[in-house]
């Protein structure tokens, strides 16, 4: 279920238009595998292009992992851990979080509630009806998989209100949780349309106003937030969801005459103002999963590439439902190559039987100090340095380098945690310093032939080496998996500092031994080997596991070692 959510997220993220910077490769070139792409990071006022590796996930999965970690780390105190540790820390590494989520995280960072005290803060909070709550609630479902839905619903609501206040967000989370919960209890295979019927049958359970048991401060704020009162808004939203589910059932009853894209477009899943609605996404995911149980691969491919949709979240929620009902074998190579797959599988297993040993909850001051200390150490640490994260995990710096995009520069740091999560932090975003430009004196403007000849030896500069490959997309995926980032790229080339890899003009495959060997030093050879083998490259381990080689292109072998100088 968690792995399916991550796969759907990673499949859909490149197709989300607000993050995409350029056209993507044709589907025929990337069918059946993840691919590298570029997104616009930072903000629209300070845009920075970021390279995204094959199978990397967005904030959807980051928050899902944060919720799972809070439950496993703090036990019964998971909610306080989420507010005090996870949400402030998310601001440092999030990849595409929505405005409502980031606004709430900043409030918890300042030890304030997400709903605030000022009227404008409360208006923004109780207007937040997006899918940011629904996308992350799967860990609660696993914890309560054998319990009552009432207990699950209470935890889902307590989690959801840490970032969102509108009934559409809360009911979206509850409906999605119910669909996951009931799917876990239904033996496979799932009948066509069964999940929609189950969701309608469960109306009496997920419609319950469990928000009425929340903190008094929240209830007081909610009572004044919406015209007609919160209870009326809740009932109206319940009716919206019931109508949507009924429409979804009618669409499925039409069978082959109904196209899933038509349903999504008709109900606002492709319109900018409504595509991120919590209730719309929850019902759309149920609809897509209900019609795709016999072909789950297609079930996540449709939302992942639906033009105009919130593709990463919709595909993630759909895939999590299919995972809950069908397991994870159908994910195939996607499940093996999605970012942090081993960690995600382990989190799901641990949530089934949580351990009784938990960490002591930090005080607010202790949590603040831990995060401040981490950021200070991060900024002055060298590559390969070890760091203690605010959530008390150990991590090491895998790579660090500058990012330049237009008039802006930044520094990106890639961290690998001891438990197997990869984090990418973009810091020090600032306007690039303009190069000094001055008018050249006339006496210097036209050097003589003799002057040019005498200056050549000192001014000559090696720009780099060009390497042709038969499949530049596949080669880029492999190098990204090794932690190498490309600061510049064109339509048929990618630049790794002084090495430029270029798509060969001919698509004929090379014969015999590859012409070039690229040597890469990396700290964790075993992890790199497993990652590349999971991508189906040929190769072999050498030096008792301290090195290996893989053929990533007919023209190119990559030799990887553990940072020791090669012999000979």
Regions found by a protein language model. Give the residues of each.
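Vicinal oxygen chelate
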Residues: 460-470, 489, 495, 507-568
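Short glycine/proline-centered loop/turn elements that form peptide/ligand docking sites
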Residues: 474, 490-494
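Short, ordered beta-strand-loop transition motifs
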Residues: 403-408, 487-491, 542-545
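Amphipathic alpha-helical segments
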Residues: 470-485, 528-534
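Short, charged/polar, Gly/Pro-enriched secondary-structure boundary elements
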Residues: 500-504, 508-512, 555-559, 566-567
